[in-house]
Amino acid sequence: MNKKTRSAISTAASIAIIVIIIIAGAAAYLYYSSTTSSPTTTTTTTTTTSTAQPLTGSLNLITFTDPSNAWLQAAADSFMAANPGVHITIVAQGFSSYTTTEMTSLQAQSPTYDIITDTSTSALGFANYVSNLNGKVTLNTADMPAPQLNFGGYYKLANGTTELIGVPYDTATFTIFYNQTLLSNPTLNSQFQKEYGFSMSPPWSNWQAILDVDNFLVTQTHTVKYGLITDGSQSHDIIDTYPAIYGYYYSHDSSVSGSNPNGGLLNYNIMFNGFAGSSGIPAPSFNGTAGTQALQMMYNLMQYDPQPAGTTVNYGTVFAPLQQGEAWGALMFTADAPAAFAQPPLSSSIAVSSLPGGYAETGTDFYAINKYSNNQALAATFIQYLISPSVNARIYTIAGEFPISKAATAILASNSSIPQQARNVIQAVFNTGAVGWANPPNLTITSSTLIPAFNNPIYTFLTGSTNSTSAAQQALDTAAAAWIKAVG
């Protein structure tokens, strides 16, 4: 979905890890395995930082505490150096509080914060308070993965028109990290292939293949203690993990996906049908056969988690069993890559793959402009500057996060001062971003209503004693009924 809740890693620790990876040339590296090709190369639009008339004015930008703020501050400094009449102040607050500060200010129609930061999930909650950026910011849509832009950047109004309400600045996905050395072990792989008929290593054709690897490495051979770590935390994480699994089943069931097997309808996404109902609103898609199968698969995968399932694993700990050699893989956000690499020697064995079937889930962040700001033109110019390839590339070299720009990715890929292994990571993350369509809804009521209405009954099922089809169906029916009532 998105980096909806940041991992419990301190900023200082993250920066230290980034220094190890970027400057010292990390001992760890990611190897990307996916059947999906990169987007077609296009010419990117260059961005200038000055006009015929000198830029003047002050900007206040509010964001959450994150390593990417080092890049943001550096970009602000260079922008101000090129435009002496401009002053930019960056206000960083904790992830749990910054949205409250933003919303309180916006609801009061205050011009205090010219630029706000939001995530894929929270973006539409701000839709009524931010400016339509169409005509204000020029996007080269061929230069950024469409799923990253669609999931939080666009808002479809009731009259059918679409507004650009935010601009993504990083690429982030929810996908599979795994122990490459273990899964490619010749002896184990030979034994596995004789029994199951395919390789343990990715790409995997479906989720049953993942479950087979779990069973082989944990139950049959006792090679590791845990399987693919699958986060079923009730507070938020279920709404990320379930659609990541459900995406496969959704795309293979035209009765729910219709003509939109890779993403569904804008803002509704895959947890609603890929087509509108008679009222013009799509119905929930997950309470049918495809959704039930996905939920039962999630239950089965969580049996290979640290127990009791649903209480031990969360955003801040999902990578720990993999990092410590106790699990063969983890379903997690790419933003956690620095944490996953923090502990050698196993860090050198960690690789990343797309989800079974060759897709991923999106989890990026956005900058939006306060519609009550008195400096909207200047704010748009600064955002344009941040996504220009040369500036956007520095989000990796300064902060260890991954650029949204394809041209920025190419700049980094050709930079011989960056270790080849690290360059593989950069390209890998961009590639998963291009297929990050397996997303939950990002409607205005997603955070306040839809997430708890879904997570609560699903958590009860996941932590229950039965994986029966009827129990799964009942949980999904309960969630679907609540969604129908909420959405209309």
How would you label these PLM feature ranges?
Residues M1-Q53:
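Secretory targeting signatures
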Residues S120-A127, F333-L346:
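A ligand-binding cleft/hinge motif common to bilobed small-molecule-binding domains
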Residues Q303, G329-A330, A342-T409, T463-T466:
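Extracytoplasmic/periplasmic substrate-recognition and gating elements
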Residues F430-G488:
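Conserved C-terminal helix/tail region of periplasmic/extracytoplasmic solute-binding proteins
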